[in-house]
Amino acid sequence: MTQEQLLKNLQVPSGIVDVILDTDAYNETDDQYAIAYMLLSPERINVLGLCAAPFHNANSSSPEDGMVRSYDEILHLLDLMDRNELATKVYRGARGYLPDENTPIETDASKFIVAEAKKHSPEHPLYVVAIGAITNVASAILMDRETMVNNTVIVWLGGHAKDYPHTREFNMYQDIAAARIVFGCGVPFVQLPCRGVVSHLTTTGPELTYWIKGTSKLADYLYEHTVWEADKYAKGKVWNRCIWDVSAVAWLLNDNDRFMSSYPIPALIPQYDNTYSVDPRRHPMCYVYEIKRDAIFGDLFAKLRNMK
């Protein structure tokens, strides 16, 4: 890929683009919103498939269990949206994290990503939107680096802002090796940092009640699941909840910077000590530095309310 084409692919695409979503959908509440937002945006997004990513926290007993639960949650969301025709396009991903920076974990998900990438080109790339540990995507790169670097654009919600004190963010620290592969391989790469940038994308129970509660089965599920998660730690208290993952889908819809602002920087280097290193000689990546919270939620809520 030429440098000119790389820089072009770091810009928000125009028209309808092919997208694969890689998601740890059972992790918390935000993945469900992102899946819904993606499927409710056919004017810009042609969904080729969804891949389940591993995760391990209080909602899973292991990374493998997290992936399996995420796979099931994706199917549940498709059922709520009456989109069961996509069930055959949902793929199980890695059952753990990369053992090192050279060994892929070959799964249905990583094989699917590579196979679809081969059908695309630098001029008409495949967009891989990742909103969990980026294990499946890094595995695809290790399996066929040339195809992935030339024919895809990777959009990732992960890491923290480059001036944040550390990078110990859930999606990144689970699989630092995978993050280092993606940041370092030369693929057109868009980072939406969590703390310091996307952390602005919060909502509340009263706001969800006003805008989406009672409008559909899906909307009620999103509302109830969000309140249920918040009640675990803040029942009877004031709370807000960041809907992180919606931002990665919103980047694809970001005409004229209506949802966020970004600029190219030399690709950051995630380190195993939870910091970034910087090398000005590195290839460019797209770094999102500002989120327009009201605009994103306005579009998301309108699509949820108008869902047929």
Language-model segments: residues:
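N-terminal acidic, glycine/proline-rich low-complexity segments
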Residues: 1-308
